[in-house]
Amino acid sequence: ILLILFVSINFYVHAQVDSLFQVPGTHCSMLPPKGFDKAETFSGFQQPNTGSSIMITELPTNYMVIVNSFTAESLAKAGLLLMSSDTLIFNGMTAYTYYIKQKANEVTFNKQVFIFGNNQLAVMVNGMYPEKETAVGEIILSSMKSVIYNETTAENGKEAVKFALDPTGTSMIYSGYLSGALMYSQDGKMPTQSADKAVFTVGSSFSSVAIDDTKAYTESRIKSLPYAEKTVIKTITPVTIYNINGYEIVAEGSDKENQQQLIYFVMLYPDNTSYYIMLGMTNAKYESYLSDFRKLAQTFMLK
């Protein structure tokens, strides 16, 4: 799952700040890289003319789980080449560092990745830049080394995105922010600990993508979800939310424990190069949660 964090390549940017900046959606502050602006679709910074970026991701899991997944073999399966790995002392903690290469659209990108945390939290700082942009790479690495984690700082996840939902009148409670997406669950925890495993997520595209047939694209995206080989689409219906057209899919499938689950899936297309995506899942009370998922989706709005 973590490997999908590396695939976004096209970004926008511009700015210079000489003081620590709290990165929205995280508990981290850092010196913004020179010539970069705050990203609009993820937690971090981006630069337009080079396609470079720094992304910070916080995950509610033991950081060694993430470290152990960064093997040459697993990265290679995602088209990533591990060049080297090391450790460094980072704000009093041990950080695992990785130097990775990836080719996309005939361009080779270098990636510098820091992973640190504790037995309950993993923080991943991912810097990416074209191989030929060595000066930009030095700026990114310097900025990455300035990251400071403060658990008492509010994550401000809702401020990190340009959309909003209102769960009032539903069983869903805001549970957190992850990689540009707002998360909701029945118990307000991430990951959820409720027996029904009911969750709802809303996010957006990271970069431009050519979309010729929005219906076909929606179907292809639901079929790309984890364990989608057992997913059966029950209905697919045109939908308009906040004056943005798209499609709603109701499906049934299985989770990683092979338990049956309801899948509610919505994609909205403001144009042919971007989208907003909403996903609701539950292992029980299908009719009740389907009603809640639909009600929550209908509150989607842009800020």
Identify the function of each model-found stretch.
Residues I54-T57, L121-E131, F200-G203, Y264, ...:
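Short, well-ordered beta-strand elements
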